[in-house]
Design a protein with these regions (language model features):
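Internal, well-ordered domain-core segments that constitute the primary functional module
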Residues: 1-75
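Long, compositionally biased stretches enriched for glycine and/or charged residues
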Residues: 47-307
């Protein structure tokens, strides 16, 4: 346990599962769980609106990587419908940067443009981009290359670039440092930490115990919603009730994540299999068992024994 005067800001993944686990294993520690993906989407919204990110205020509900923007305001003006119209046609990509984004990173462009299909199917709200994996799984499988997975892209892309840059610096060579300048994720965590340290009451999207904030979700769910960050922690914004479709999606994923935590704490193979079966990225119990067994073998040096 950390000192009662300290805050632990958890930026690790999978954030939702880590949040649930720490709630159970360290209930008295002051831990604030955060993720930058909603802020990254907000940055794309700001680009579309040709404004600064600081001018936006959003309403949002869900779990980590599993949420929806219900309202977006720019300098106090409600621009939600304007954004929906744009995203339904272009995704989270501004008209001006569409071609440039394709050249820069086709995989990110694919991610941001996938939002247009989701908005056209489910026009109530604006989605977090991670919904592509849960709602458009067949599209993702068709797009992915088994010989060049996302993990491989990170290893051979960003990680290789960083190692090469470090080696050049060690050899006294000059490099272009601008490629490593902080993005919205770095600015986001600084704003959160500043708010905790200096009681700024900054309004941020964070992961907190529900406790009635989303009225028709379980109180112990770790929900991602707006909160005012103070020296004493987050003061969540009350969301109220959410529609049945979104409630059903979230409750299923919340059950999945809760079972993952229970499986690890109890060393339960049964609960791990139940968790995998509930996950929307896995099409059947047969596939869930196959994936679980392969992951157990691949991670036997790191995982607890599941019996």
């Amino acid at each position: 346990y950390a000192s009662k005067t300290y805050w632990i800001v958890n930026y690790s993944n999978p954030a939702a599962i880590v949040a649930k686990a720490t709630q159970i294993l360290r209930p008295n520690a002051r831990i604030l769980n955060i993720c930058d993906m909603p802020v990254e989407v907000e940055a794309r919204m700001a680009e579309i609106l040709d404004t600064d990110l600081s001018n936006l205020e959003v309403d949002y509900f869900g779990l980590n990587h599993y949420g929806w923007f219900t309202k977006v305001q720019c300098n106090g003006e409600d621009v939600t419908e304007k954004l929906k119209k744009h995203v339904a046609e272009y995704g989270y990509v501004s008209k001006a940067s569409y071609e440039d984004a394709l050249v820069k990173d086709p995989d990110w462009l694919h991610t941001f443009t996938n939002a247009k299909k989701i908005v056209n199917y489910f026009p109530d709200y604006l989605p977090n981009t991670y919904w592509q994996y849960y709602l458009l799984g067949d599209d993702i499988v068709d797009y992915m290359d088994i010989n060049n997975t996302r993990g491989m892209q990170v290893i051979h892309g960003r990680e290789t670039k960083i190692r090469e840059a470090v080696k050049k610096l060690e050899n006294g060579e000059k490099i272009d440092l601008t490629q490593f300048y902080v993005g919205v994720h770095g600015k986001f965590i600084v704003e959160v930490v500043k708010a905790l340290a200096y009681d700024t009451r900054s309004r941020q999207l964070v992961i907190v115990k529900n406790d009635g904030a989303v009225k028709n979700l379980p109180d112990d769910a770790m929900v991602e919603i707006p909160a005012y960050i103070t020296k004493d922690g987050p003061e969540p914004v009350r969301v109220g009730e959410i529609p049945r479709f979104y409630k059903g999606l979230i409750e299923q994923q919340d059950a999945c994540e809760g079972l993952v935590v229970e499986a690890v704490i109890e060393g339960s193979y049964k609960k791990a299999l139940q968790a995998f079966t509930l996950n929307r990225t896995i099409p059947s119990a047969n596939v869930a068992k196959e994936i679980l067994d392969e992951m157990i073998e691949a991670n036997k040096e790191y995982w607890v024994e599941l019996k």
